[in-house]
């Protein structure tokens, strides 16, 4: 038997005044969902137990039978495994979003974040941005000094891996939660100030490399947002998950 798991991630949404105080889901005409619910089993479950973050990275682990309190080690390690990036003990993985910051040569910390995805940059443009960073002498030297690399991706969310790293002493803030805000207070910080500075310095340097880079200017000329920055977040270390097929006799 085949199973289809449909996850309405964030579908509940919030009440909207223009909809009479209803959520979009409450307001919508959804006869198919209503029919499935009427013929199925409906209930409540806590997929994001406290103190873990309420997000897809914890919820999906739980939905597929892994206790996130035991097995959750961050979003990025799971994404790394999905694309074949092998983490060894001591490695830490990070999302390295390609972002759009306010254009211009004002101080980096005074810029605002315009888009957590650089306007959903994808394809060759996204690959060209990471290639520009990896080929820049100053940025590539800084990466090597940090014992890090950035894996290219045809999307706005490449992954970065840092060897010999414990990220638990640094606070990394999700960029999508702070659109339109000044980035200075949002940069990596925490009790491990030296490690936080490594990431903040790389983010600052990336903006300097990308602000007037040809791929940035090309996108702006096309009326798109330029990917003039990177943003590290979603940190995590190598995860060890139970074998799904061994436990449930099924695979995907």
Model-based region annotation:
Residues 228-252:
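Long, well-ordered mid-to-C-terminal structural blocks that present hydrophobic/aromatic surfaces
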């Amino acid at each position: 038997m085949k199973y289809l798991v449909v996850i309405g991630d964030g579908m509940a949404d919030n009440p909207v005044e223009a909809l009479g105080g209803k959520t979009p889901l409450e307001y919508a005409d959804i006869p198919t969902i209503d029919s499935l619910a009427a013929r199925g089993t409906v209930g409540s479950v806590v997929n994001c137990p406290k103190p873990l973050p309420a997000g897809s990275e914890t919820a999906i682990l739980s939905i597929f039978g892994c206790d996130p309190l035991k097995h959750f080690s961050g979003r990025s390690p799971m994404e790394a495994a999905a694309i074949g990036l092998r983490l060894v003990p001591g490695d830490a993985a990070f999302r390295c979003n390609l972002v759009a910051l306010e254009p211009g040569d004002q101080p980096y910390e005074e810029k605002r974040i315009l888009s957590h995805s650089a306007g959903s940059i994808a394809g060759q443009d996204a690959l060209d941005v990471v290639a520009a960073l990896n080929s820049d002498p100053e940025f590539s030297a800084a990466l090597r000094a940090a014992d890090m690399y950035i894996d290219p991706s045809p999307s706005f969310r490449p992954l970065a891996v840092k060897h010999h790293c414990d990220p638990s002493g640094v606070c990394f803030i999700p960029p999508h939660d702070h659109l339109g805000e000044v980035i200075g207070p949002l940069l990596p910080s925490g009790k491990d100030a030296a490690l936080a500075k490594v990431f903040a310095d790389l983010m600052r340097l990336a903006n300097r490399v990308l602000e007037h880079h040809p791929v940035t200017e090309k996108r702006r000329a096309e009326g798109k947002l330029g990917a003039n920055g990177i943003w590290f977040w979603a940190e995590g270390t190598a995860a060890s998950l139970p074998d799904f097929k061994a436990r449930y006799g099924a695979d995907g």
